[in-house]
């Protein structure tokens, strides 16, 4: 019987996606998020009793490592790399690392119970790869394996990115997805009618994971995945560029994005905590973009900028 090491990281909610990605990079085969905010304000229904919880900025991210890895070495590596996040302006809070051994059957049950089909936007629903789900009329299904890496698509930053794509895509566009992670934004772009999608990520693990998720979704052979450092060296012009990454990294792609976005095209950015919003907005406007839409969900911000000479329909125009 195989055994696994279950490792739980208690961090600031702001660091959810970054830490989840890091856990996968260090060998985890799956992650699950426990957030007290998910229970706040919910009424008991369908026989379920939600626990009494208080608002907290901390969340618990549970990762599952095969017993072939030395969990103490993993914990030491994680502690060092989490400390480096502060240098990117991402506050992790007081990090605690707890671990325990788990048999394979328990891991399978514990891991999958966190994930159910989730309607994200008017048209888009994300469905775990193992779920037999029948789409309703007009519903577009994105199949993902949440255990692979890089989130499930239900984080506020991803939700707002998907909503923005749904608003700007009309069919036939070329899209560039910067920092693709799970590939969810590329898959959504294809389902929403984009003609060609180019997905880039600096992490080779993300490139593999994105391709595996893409392969699970029929009709997505118009998505081209490659390793890349933001937009460096990219010559392909696009109608839409979307990037759901840290604010301190977003400011380094706005100039290249303006170079590549076609006239009347869009730059969608997400992953921006409120205290970094002004910095990102100023970077995009300095590059030549005009703000068309600003979205806020909790402490997270997302935006749609437009490359246009007609500013009558943009914020402040």
From Swiss-Prot:
Keywords assigned: Cytoplasm, Methyltransferase, S-adenosyl-L-methionine, Transferase
Keyword Methyltransferase: yes
GO biological process terms, semicolon-separated: methylation
UniProt xrefs under SUPFAM superfamilies: S-adenosyl-L-methionine-dependent methyltransferases (SSF53335)
Gene Ontology CC: cytoplasm
Chief location: cytoplasm
GO molecular function: protein-lysine N-methyltransferase activity
Residues annotated to bind S-adenosyl-L-methionine: 158, 179, 201, 244
Catalytic activity: L-lysyl-[protein] + 3 S-adenosyl-L-methionine = N(6),N(6),N(6)-trimethyl-L-lysyl-[protein] + 3 S-adenosyl-L-homocysteine + 3 H(+)
Compartments it resides in: Cytoplasm
EC number, UniProt record: 2.1.1.-
Family that this chain belongs to: Belongs to the methyltransferase superfamily. PrmA family.
HAMAP family on file: Methyltr_PrmA (MF_00735)
Function: Methylates ribosomal protein L11.
Protein name, UniProt field: Ribosomal protein L11 methyltransferase
Organism ancestry: Bacteria, Bacillati, Bacillota, Bacilli, Lactobacillales
Gene: prmA
């Amino acid at each position: 019987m195989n055994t696994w090491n279950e490792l739980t990281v208690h961090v600031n909610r702001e660091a959810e996606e970054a830490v989840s990605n890091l856990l996968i990079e260090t060998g985890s085969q799956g992650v699950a998020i426990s957030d007290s905010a998910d229970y706040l304000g919910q009424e008991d229904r369908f026989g379920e009793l939600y626990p009494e919880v208080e608002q907290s900025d901390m969340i618990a991210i549970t990762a599952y490592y095969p017993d072939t890895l030395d969990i103490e070495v993993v914990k030491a590596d994680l502690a060092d790399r989490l400390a480096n996040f502060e240098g990117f302006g991402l506050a992790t809070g007081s990090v605690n690392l707890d671990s325990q051994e788990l048999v394979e059957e328990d891991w399978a049950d514990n891991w999958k119970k966190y994930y159910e089909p989730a309607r994200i936007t008017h048209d888009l629903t994300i469905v775990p790869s193992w779920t037999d789900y029948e789409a309703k009329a007009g519903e577009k299904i994105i199949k993902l394996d949440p255990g692979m890496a890089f989130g499930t698509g239900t984080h506020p930053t991803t939700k707002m990115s998907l909503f923005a794509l749904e608003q700007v895509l009309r069919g036939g566009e070329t899209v560039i997805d910067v920092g693709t992670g799970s590939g969810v934004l590329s898959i959504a772009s294809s389902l929403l009618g984009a003609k060609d999608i180019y997905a880039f990520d600096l992490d080779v693990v993300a490139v593999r994971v994105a391709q595996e998720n893409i392969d699970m979704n029929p009709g997505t052979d118009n998505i081209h995945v490659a390793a890349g450092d933001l937009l460096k060296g990219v010559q392909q012009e696009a109608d839409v560029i979307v990037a759901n990454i840290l604010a301190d990294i977003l400011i380094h792609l706005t100039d290249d994005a303006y170079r590549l976005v076609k006239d009347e095209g869009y730059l969608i950015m997400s992953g921006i905590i409120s205290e970094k919003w002004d910095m990102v907005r100023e970077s995009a406007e300095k590059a030549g973009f005009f703000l068309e839409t600003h979205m806020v969900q909790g402490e997270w911000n997302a935006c749609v900028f437009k490359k246009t000479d007609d500013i009558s329909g943009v914020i402040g125009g």
